[in-house]
Curated annotation (Swiss-Prot):
Keywords from the UniProt entry: Aspartyl protease, Cell inner membrane, Cell membrane, Hydrolase, Membrane, Protease, Transmembrane, Transmembrane helix
Record organism: Francisella tularensis subsp. novicida (strain U112)
InterPro entries: Peptidase_A8
Pfam families given in the database record: Peptidase_A8
An individual GO BP term: proteolysis
Identification of the protein by name: Lipoprotein signal peptidase
């Protein structure tokens, strides 16, 4: 356990992301009407949607049980791999650890939805005029931020020789 103590904060970050994700999805599901936009700004709405597909609602028209099982399994495998990476990553690799924690929290937040509801709740709707970015949630944001940070770190940090 002493080996994991320095990495505990990264697991706590993942748990906080899961909690924020599930709580905001609960609020959206409780207070928003399905597919009815609530205008917040000229470029941002809250719009409750149920995503039966993958990221950006890919494959969402084909709502089959194999698809739910496949996406749930992929999320669970990703979470297991991320936990392993956090455990094995040197404590000095803080950017990687932070990124892995973001992705882990997001993967588990969306896994929960898929496993217990059969779909992921999306509600954040950004747009320019009539062009809407696909709706998303806190988990999606955490995953995206984690991946972007990992890519940026790999591109802009020098490897020690």
């Amino acid at each position: 356990m002493n080996l994991l103590r320095p990495k505990l904060k990264y697991f706590i970050l993942a748990i906080l992301i899961i909690a924020a994700d599930l709580y905001t999805k609960y609020l959206a599901n409780t207070y928003l009407e399905f597919a009815q936009s609530v205008k917040i700004t000229s470029f941002f709405n809250l719009t409750l949607l149920y995503n039966h597909g993958a990221a950006f609602s890919l494959l969402s028209n084909d709502q089959t049980s194999w698809q739910m099982i496949m996406f749930s399994t992929i999320s669970l495998i990703a979470a297991i791999v991320l936990i392993y990476l956090i455990i094995k990553q040197p404590i000095t690799e803080k950017i990687n650890l932070f990124s892995f924690a973001l992705i882990l929290g997001g993967a588990l937040g969306n896994f929960y939805d898929r496993a217990f509801q059969g779909y992921v709740i999306d509600f954040l709707d950004f747009h320019i005029g009539n062009y809407h970015w696909p709706s998303f949630n806190i988990a999606d944001s955490a995953i995206t931020c984690g991946v972007v940070i990992l890519i940026a770190a790999s591109l802009f940090t020098k490897k020690k020789s």
